[in-house]
Amino acid sequence: MAKEENKSGEQSSSEWKQFIYNPSSGEILGRTASSWALILLFYLVFYGFLAGLFTLTMWVMLQTLDDSVPKYRDRVSFPGLMISPKSAGLEISFSKSDKSHMKSILKFFTHFYHHTMTPYKLQMCSARKAITTEQEGVEEKKSCQFNRSSLGPCAGLEGNEYFGYNDGSPCVLVKMNRIIGLKPDGNPHINCTSKAENISLQYYPEYGKIDLMYYPYYGKKTHVNYVQPLVAVKITPSNSTGTSEIVLECKLYGSPNLKNNDDRDKFLGRVNFKLEIKD
């Protein structure tokens, strides 16, 4: 019985060796060298054709795309609003006596102004006039200067280095999100409301106006030095002591081709945020 098992094992081993290489026929793994060469050539041609077809279709598709402007923009037709300084859950909380936390807010404002309002390669433009006709066919579009001093006490210039956070009257910057090709009609401006009756709101520039000279926006690649217009809102509670919690909603008004109310998108033309001021 044991001898039969040994013979069966030797036969199986011999069959495997012959399958790997058969010296009588010269076959390797059941195929001759010419058969292996033909099948490898077939797969080389087949996958080479597939790769070439894929490359060709990608090249044809890329010819239909503009390097500066997205082809499909219908899903983002109206801009939203956003505030600065940015915070988790759009809740800005600070203490007038906490210098370390206040420093982080001041650092944000300083960094923000430095990187968004440098006058390098910017030019003076005519107020309330969109620059469109002179921009056609130009590779790098003109960018208008934003006068930081128009933000009044929220500009952080001499005498207002703390942006109102040291005395409990903080400044919040509101901006409209960028959309390529957007041209607001009318006189767009931002207005904020709150259910709290004990606060005063001041807008800079006056009436929260957004100047048309900053539009249209042509995209990051073409409008390299574009500066976004800002509206600063200075919030002053009537009670200067204790803790104040204020919920505000800022909306975009004055432009008939822009929306500020959509149940499916709470940021479309508006933004809600909470402000907590502590002693």
From Swiss-Prot:
Q: Which residues are glycosylated?
A: 147, 191, 198, 239
An annotated GO cellular component of this protein is:
sodium:potassium-exchanging ATPase complex
Q: Which GO MF terms does the UniProt record name?
A: ATPase activator activity
Q: Which PROSITE patterns match?
A: ATPASE_NA_K_BETA_1, ATPASE_NA_K_BETA_2
| One BP annotation, GO | intracellular sodium ion homeostasis
| InterPro entries attached to this UniProt entry | Na/K_ATPase_sub_beta, Na/K_ATPase_sub_beta_sf
The free-text tissue note of the record is: Abundantly in brain, eye and testis, at a lower extent in spleen.
* Superkingdom classification of source: Eukaryota
Topology of the protein relative to the lipid bilayer: Single-pass type II membrane protein
Primary localisation category: membrane
Ordered alphabetically, the record's keywords are:
Cell membrane, Disulfide bond, Glycoprotein, Ion transport, Membrane, Potassium, Potassium transport, Signal-anchor, Sodium, Sodium transport, Sodium/potassium transport, Transmembrane, Transmembrane helix, Transport
| Disulphide bond pairs | 125-144, 154-171, 192-250
Q: Where in the cell is it found?
A: Cell membrane
Q: Which stretches face the Extracellular side?
A: 57-279
The UniProt entry, under Pfam families, shows: Na_K-ATPase
Spell out the subunit comment: The sodium/potassium-transporting ATPase is composed of a catalytic alpha subunit, an auxiliary non-catalytic beta subunit and an additional regulatory subunit.
Q: Which PANTHER family match?
A: SODIUM/POTASSIUM-DEPENDENT ATPASE BETA SUBUNIT (PTHR11523), SODIUM_POTASSIUM-TRANSPORTING ATPASE SUBUNIT BETA-3 (PTHR11523:SF47)
The family line of this record is:
Belongs to the X(+)/potassium ATPases subunit beta family.
Cite the NCBIfam families for this sequence: Na_K_ATPase_bet
Q: What is this protein called?
A: Sodium/potassium-transporting ATPase subunit beta-3
Q: Give the species this sequence originates from.
A: Rhinella marina
What broad taxonomic lineage does this protein's source fall under? Answer: Eukaryota, Metazoa, Chordata, Craniata, Vertebrata
